[in-house]
Design a protein with these regions (language model features):
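Predominantly soluble domains enriched in secretory-pathway, periplasmic, or organellar proteins
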Residues: 4, 11, 17-321
Length: 321
Protein backbone atom coordinates (compact mmCIF):
# COMPACT_ATOMS: atom_id res chain seq x y z
CA UNK A 1 0.00 0.00 0.00
CA UNK A 2 2.77 2.42 1.04
CA UNK A 3 4.84 1.62 -2.07
CA UNK A 4 1.80 2.15 -4.33
CA UNK A 5 1.11 5.50 -2.72
CA UNK A 6 4.73 6.61 -3.21
CA UNK A 7 4.66 5.56 -6.87
CA UNK A 8 1.38 7.36 -7.41
CA UNK A 9 2.75 10.52 -5.83
CA UNK A 10 5.91 10.29 -7.94
CA UNK A 11 3.77 9.91 -11.03
CA UNK A 12 1.76 12.97 -10.07
CA UNK A 13 4.91 14.99 -9.46
CA UNK A 14 6.38 13.89 -12.80
CA UNK A 15 3.20 14.82 -14.66
CA UNK A 16 3.01 18.17 -12.91
CA UNK A 17 6.65 18.89 -13.72
CA UNK A 18 6.10 18.01 -17.37
CA UNK A 19 3.07 20.28 -17.59
CA UNK A 20 4.88 23.13 -15.89
CA UNK A 21 7.81 22.79 -18.29
CA UNK A 22 5.64 23.38 -21.37
CA UNK A 23 6.00 26.88 -22.76
CA UNK A 24 4.60 28.58 -25.84
CA UNK A 25 6.84 31.09 -27.61
CA UNK A 26 5.35 33.78 -29.87
CA UNK A 27 7.28 36.23 -32.05
CA UNK A 28 5.84 39.76 -32.13
CA UNK A 29 6.76 41.23 -35.51
CA UNK A 30 6.09 44.86 -34.62
CA UNK A 31 7.03 44.54 -30.96
CA UNK A 32 10.57 43.26 -31.56
CA UNK A 33 9.95 40.76 -28.82
CA UNK A 34 9.13 37.17 -27.90
CA UNK A 35 6.19 36.47 -25.60
CA UNK A 36 6.54 33.38 -23.40
CA UNK A 37 3.29 31.74 -22.25
CA UNK A 38 2.91 29.06 -19.58
CA UNK A 39 1.51 26.03 -21.38
CA UNK A 40 -0.61 24.96 -18.39
CA UNK A 41 -2.09 28.19 -17.05
CA UNK A 42 -1.96 29.98 -20.44
CA UNK A 43 -0.71 33.06 -18.63
CA UNK A 44 2.05 35.25 -20.05
CA UNK A 45 5.30 34.59 -18.17
CA UNK A 46 7.63 37.02 -19.90
CA UNK A 47 8.10 39.39 -22.81
CA UNK A 48 11.68 39.32 -24.04
CA UNK A 49 13.25 42.00 -26.28
CA UNK A 50 14.90 40.52 -29.38
CA UNK A 51 16.09 41.76 -32.77
CA UNK A 52 14.19 43.83 -35.29
CA UNK A 53 11.08 42.38 -36.93
CA UNK A 54 11.11 38.82 -35.54
CA UNK A 55 9.05 36.53 -37.74
CA UNK A 56 9.75 32.82 -38.19
CA UNK A 57 10.72 30.89 -35.05
CA UNK A 58 11.58 27.23 -34.59
CA UNK A 59 12.44 25.07 -31.59
CA UNK A 60 15.50 22.81 -31.57
CA UNK A 61 14.56 19.11 -31.44
CA UNK A 62 15.82 18.85 -27.85
CA UNK A 63 13.93 21.98 -26.78
CA UNK A 64 17.05 23.73 -25.49
CA UNK A 65 17.10 26.56 -28.00
CA UNK A 66 14.62 28.76 -29.82
CA UNK A 67 15.84 30.13 -33.13
CA UNK A 68 14.44 33.50 -34.22
CA UNK A 69 14.46 35.11 -37.67
CA UNK A 70 15.33 38.74 -36.87
CA UNK A 71 14.40 39.77 -40.39
CA UNK A 72 15.45 43.43 -40.38
CA UNK A 73 18.75 42.56 -38.68
CA UNK A 74 19.57 39.94 -41.34
CA UNK A 75 20.39 37.36 -38.70
CA UNK A 76 19.11 34.36 -36.74
CA UNK A 77 19.13 34.80 -32.97
CA UNK A 78 19.54 31.91 -30.54
CA UNK A 79 17.55 31.96 -27.31
CA UNK A 80 18.29 29.62 -24.40
CA UNK A 81 14.81 28.35 -23.49
CA UNK A 82 15.74 27.70 -19.85
CA UNK A 83 16.97 31.25 -19.17
CA UNK A 84 15.07 33.10 -21.93
CA UNK A 85 18.31 34.89 -22.83
CA UNK A 86 19.80 35.46 -26.28
CA UNK A 87 23.03 33.46 -26.28
CA UNK A 88 24.24 33.78 -29.85
CA UNK A 89 23.49 34.42 -33.50
CA UNK A 90 23.69 32.51 -36.75
CA UNK A 91 24.58 33.89 -40.17
CA UNK A 92 21.86 34.29 -42.77
CA UNK A 93 21.26 36.21 -45.95
CA UNK A 94 19.20 39.41 -46.14
CA UNK A 95 15.70 39.35 -44.66
CA UNK A 96 15.41 35.80 -43.29
CA UNK A 97 11.73 34.95 -42.90
CA UNK A 98 11.32 31.24 -42.18
CA UNK A 99 13.66 28.35 -41.45
CA UNK A 100 13.58 24.71 -40.45
CA UNK A 101 15.94 22.28 -38.72
CA UNK A 102 16.98 18.76 -39.65
CA UNK A 103 15.50 16.06 -37.39
CA UNK A 104 18.90 15.37 -35.81
CA UNK A 105 19.28 19.04 -34.91
CA UNK A 106 22.55 19.56 -36.79
CA UNK A 107 21.48 21.60 -39.84
CA UNK A 108 19.35 24.67 -40.41
CA UNK A 109 17.87 25.80 -43.71
CA UNK A 110 16.97 29.51 -43.93
CA UNK A 111 14.86 31.24 -46.57
CA UNK A 112 16.31 34.70 -47.29
CA UNK A 113 13.56 36.68 -48.95
CA UNK A 114 15.71 39.45 -50.44
CA UNK A 115 18.49 37.49 -52.18
CA UNK A 116 16.62 34.45 -53.56
CA UNK A 117 18.79 32.04 -51.59
CA UNK A 118 18.42 29.31 -49.00
CA UNK A 119 21.29 29.43 -46.51
CA UNK A 120 22.48 26.14 -44.99
CA UNK A 121 24.02 26.49 -41.51
CA UNK A 122 25.84 23.87 -39.45
CA UNK A 123 24.30 24.20 -35.98
CA UNK A 124 27.24 22.50 -34.28
CA UNK A 125 29.88 24.91 -35.59
CA UNK A 126 27.33 27.71 -36.14
CA UNK A 127 28.94 28.35 -39.52
CA UNK A 128 27.34 28.60 -42.97
CA UNK A 129 27.91 25.63 -45.28
CA UNK A 130 26.37 26.82 -48.52
CA UNK A 131 23.88 29.08 -50.25
CA UNK A 132 21.40 27.49 -52.62
CA UNK A 133 19.88 29.63 -55.41
CA UNK A 134 16.10 29.22 -55.49
CA UNK A 135 13.13 31.17 -56.89
CA UNK A 136 12.21 34.79 -56.32
CA UNK A 137 11.25 35.74 -52.74
CA UNK A 138 11.82 32.43 -50.94
CA UNK A 139 9.59 32.03 -47.91
CA UNK A 140 8.53 28.60 -46.67
CA UNK A 141 11.04 25.93 -45.61
CA UNK A 142 10.18 22.38 -44.60
CA UNK A 143 12.60 19.52 -43.88
CA UNK A 144 11.45 15.94 -44.42
CA UNK A 145 11.24 13.71 -41.34
CA UNK A 146 14.07 11.53 -42.66
CA UNK A 147 16.22 14.62 -43.21
CA UNK A 148 16.90 13.85 -46.87
CA UNK A 149 14.87 16.64 -48.46
CA UNK A 150 14.04 20.30 -48.01
CA UNK A 151 11.10 21.96 -49.71
CA UNK A 152 11.40 25.73 -50.18
CA UNK A 153 8.56 27.86 -51.53
CA UNK A 154 9.24 30.96 -53.63
CA UNK A 155 6.48 33.56 -53.45
CA UNK A 156 6.98 35.31 -56.80
CA UNK A 157 8.05 32.25 -58.82
CA UNK A 158 5.04 30.33 -57.42
CA UNK A 159 7.01 27.13 -56.99
CA UNK A 160 7.92 24.51 -54.42
CA UNK A 161 11.58 23.56 -54.85
CA UNK A 162 12.82 20.13 -53.72
CA UNK A 163 16.41 20.31 -52.44
CA UNK A 164 18.60 17.25 -51.86
CA UNK A 165 20.23 17.74 -48.44
CA UNK A 166 23.32 15.75 -49.47
CA UNK A 167 24.13 17.71 -52.62
CA UNK A 168 22.33 20.99 -51.78
CA UNK A 169 20.92 20.97 -55.30
CA UNK A 170 17.36 21.41 -56.54
CA UNK A 171 16.05 18.20 -58.10
CA UNK A 172 12.39 19.09 -58.72
CA UNK A 173 10.25 22.19 -59.10
CA UNK A 174 6.48 22.02 -58.61
CA UNK A 175 4.31 24.88 -59.85
CA UNK A 176 1.65 25.85 -57.30
CA UNK A 177 -0.82 28.70 -56.94
CA UNK A 178 0.09 32.33 -56.40
CA UNK A 179 2.33 33.36 -53.50
CA UNK A 180 3.15 30.06 -51.77
CA UNK A 181 3.80 30.67 -48.10
CA UNK A 182 4.35 27.44 -46.19
CA UNK A 183 5.53 23.87 -46.75
CA UNK A 184 4.59 21.14 -44.25
CA UNK A 185 5.71 17.50 -44.48
CA UNK A 186 3.37 14.84 -43.13
CA UNK A 187 4.82 12.59 -40.42
CA UNK A 188 5.27 9.68 -42.86
CA UNK A 189 7.01 11.89 -45.47
CA UNK A 190 4.37 10.85 -48.01
CA UNK A 191 2.97 14.32 -48.66
CA UNK A 192 3.96 17.97 -48.61
CA UNK A 193 1.18 20.48 -48.01
CA UNK A 194 1.99 23.86 -49.62
CA UNK A 195 -0.22 26.88 -48.90
CA UNK A 196 -0.71 29.68 -51.43
CA UNK A 197 -1.69 33.01 -49.87
CA UNK A 198 -3.05 34.90 -52.90
CA UNK A 199 -4.23 31.72 -54.61
CA UNK A 200 -6.20 30.85 -51.48
CA UNK A 201 -5.42 27.14 -51.86
CA UNK A 202 -3.33 24.31 -50.45
CA UNK A 203 -1.54 22.02 -52.90
CA UNK A 204 -0.96 18.49 -51.59
CA UNK A 205 2.18 17.16 -53.28
CA UNK A 206 2.93 13.43 -53.51
CA UNK A 207 6.54 12.96 -52.43
CA UNK A 208 7.01 9.83 -54.55
CA UNK A 209 5.93 11.43 -57.83
CA UNK A 210 6.59 15.11 -57.03
CA UNK A 211 3.18 15.86 -58.52
CA UNK A 212 0.16 17.64 -57.05
CA UNK A 213 -2.31 14.93 -56.02
CA UNK A 214 -5.00 17.30 -54.77
CA UNK A 215 -5.67 21.01 -54.49
CA UNK A 216 -7.82 22.24 -51.60
CA UNK A 217 -9.92 25.39 -52.01
CA UNK A 218 -11.88 27.26 -49.36
CA UNK A 219 -15.25 29.02 -49.38
CA UNK A 220 -16.65 30.80 -46.34
CA UNK A 221 -20.18 32.24 -46.47
CA UNK A 222 -20.07 36.02 -46.07
CA UNK A 223 -16.29 36.28 -46.49
CA UNK A 224 -14.92 37.76 -49.76
CA UNK A 225 -12.80 35.35 -51.78
CA UNK A 226 -9.82 37.73 -51.75
CA UNK A 227 -9.80 37.67 -47.94
CA UNK A 228 -9.33 33.89 -47.85
CA UNK A 229 -5.54 33.62 -47.85
CA UNK A 230 -3.94 30.29 -46.95
CA UNK A 231 -0.82 30.64 -44.81
CA UNK A 232 0.18 28.35 -41.90
CA UNK A 233 -0.48 24.60 -42.15
CA UNK A 234 -0.39 21.71 -39.70
CA UNK A 235 -1.30 18.04 -40.25
CA UNK A 236 -1.56 15.68 -37.27
CA UNK A 237 0.85 12.76 -36.94
CA UNK A 238 -1.76 10.16 -37.91
CA UNK A 239 -2.71 12.18 -41.02
CA UNK A 240 -6.35 12.35 -39.99
CA UNK A 241 -6.88 16.09 -39.69
CA UNK A 242 -5.20 19.15 -41.14
CA UNK A 243 -5.51 22.78 -40.08
CA UNK A 244 -4.96 25.77 -42.37
CA UNK A 245 -4.70 29.41 -41.28
CA UNK A 246 -6.69 31.64 -43.63
CA UNK A 247 -5.19 35.05 -42.85
CA UNK A 248 -7.63 38.00 -43.11
CA UNK A 249 -10.58 35.58 -43.22
CA UNK A 250 -9.94 35.16 -39.46
CA UNK A 251 -10.64 31.44 -39.74
CA UNK A 252 -8.88 28.12 -39.33
CA UNK A 253 -10.00 25.54 -41.87
CA UNK A 254 -10.33 22.00 -40.52
CA UNK A 255 -9.62 19.49 -43.29
CA UNK A 256 -10.02 15.72 -43.46
CA UNK A 257 -6.43 14.77 -44.33
CA UNK A 258 -7.53 11.59 -46.12
CA UNK A 259 -10.36 12.90 -48.30
CA UNK A 260 -9.10 16.52 -48.42
CA UNK A 261 -12.62 17.76 -47.71
CA UNK A 262 -13.06 20.88 -45.59
CA UNK A 263 -15.06 19.88 -42.50
CA UNK A 264 -15.36 23.11 -40.59
CA UNK A 265 -14.17 26.69 -40.19
CA UNK A 266 -13.17 27.96 -36.75
CA UNK A 267 -13.42 31.68 -36.01
CA UNK A 268 -10.23 32.92 -34.34
CA UNK A 269 -8.50 36.31 -34.02
CA UNK A 270 -7.79 38.80 -36.78
CA UNK A 271 -5.31 37.92 -39.55
CA UNK A 272 -4.45 34.43 -38.35
CA UNK A 273 -1.00 33.54 -39.61
CA UNK A 274 0.98 30.64 -38.15
CA UNK A 275 0.12 27.50 -36.19
CA UNK A 276 1.71 25.05 -33.76
CA UNK A 277 0.46 21.91 -32.04
CA UNK A 278 1.08 21.12 -28.41
CA UNK A 279 3.45 18.10 -28.27
CA UNK A 280 0.53 15.73 -27.55
CA UNK A 281 -1.52 17.38 -30.35
CA UNK A 282 -4.42 18.02 -27.96
CA UNK A 283 -4.21 21.76 -28.62
CA UNK A 284 -3.45 24.01 -31.56
CA UNK A 285 -2.10 27.53 -31.08
CA UNK A 286 -2.65 30.25 -33.70
CA UNK A 287 -1.03 33.68 -34.03
CA UNK A 288 -3.48 36.47 -34.83
CA UNK A 289 -1.52 39.46 -36.12
CA UNK A 290 -4.08 42.26 -36.11
CA UNK A 291 -5.86 41.36 -32.85
CA UNK A 292 -2.49 40.91 -31.07
CA UNK A 293 -3.34 37.58 -29.48
CA UNK A 294 -3.13 33.84 -29.90
CA UNK A 295 -6.10 31.49 -30.02
CA UNK A 296 -6.03 28.11 -28.27
CA UNK A 297 -8.01 25.39 -30.05
CA UNK A 298 -9.08 22.11 -28.46
CA UNK A 299 -8.31 19.62 -31.24
CA UNK A 300 -10.78 16.97 -30.05
CA UNK A 301 -13.80 19.24 -29.70
CA UNK A 302 -12.69 21.63 -32.48
CA UNK A 303 -13.51 24.60 -30.31
CA UNK A 304 -11.58 27.77 -29.51
CA UNK A 305 -11.16 27.60 -25.74
CA UNK A 306 -9.09 30.69 -24.99
CA UNK A 307 -7.55 33.85 -26.36
CA UNK A 308 -4.24 35.04 -24.90
CA UNK A 309 -3.07 38.65 -25.46
CA UNK A 310 0.56 38.90 -26.58
CA UNK A 311 2.69 41.63 -28.19
CA UNK A 312 2.15 43.77 -31.29
CA UNK A 313 1.53 41.78 -34.47
CA UNK A 314 2.24 38.19 -33.43
CA UNK A 315 3.70 36.19 -36.32
CA UNK A 316 5.37 32.87 -35.42
CA UNK A 317 4.70 30.30 -32.70
CA UNK A 318 6.72 27.38 -31.31
CA UNK A 319 6.21 25.08 -28.32
CA UNK A 320 8.68 23.64 -25.83
CA UNK A 321 7.60 20.49 -23.99
Amino acid sequence: MHRSLVLALLGTVSLSTALEAREIFVSNEKGNSITVIDGTSLEVKATIPVGNRPRGIVMSPDGKFLYICASDDDTIQIMDTSTHEIVGTLPSGPDPELMDISPDGTMMYIANEDDNMVTVVDLVSRQPLSEIPVGVEPEGVGVSRDGKWVVNTSETTNMAHFIDTDTHEITDNVLVDQRPRYAFWTADDAEIWVSSEIGGTVSVIDNATRQIKHKISFEIPGVPKEAIQAVGVRVDKERKKAFVALGPANRIAVVDAQTFEVEKYLLVGQRVWQLAFSPDERFLYTTNGVSNDISVIDVDSLEVVKSVPVGPYPWGVAVKD
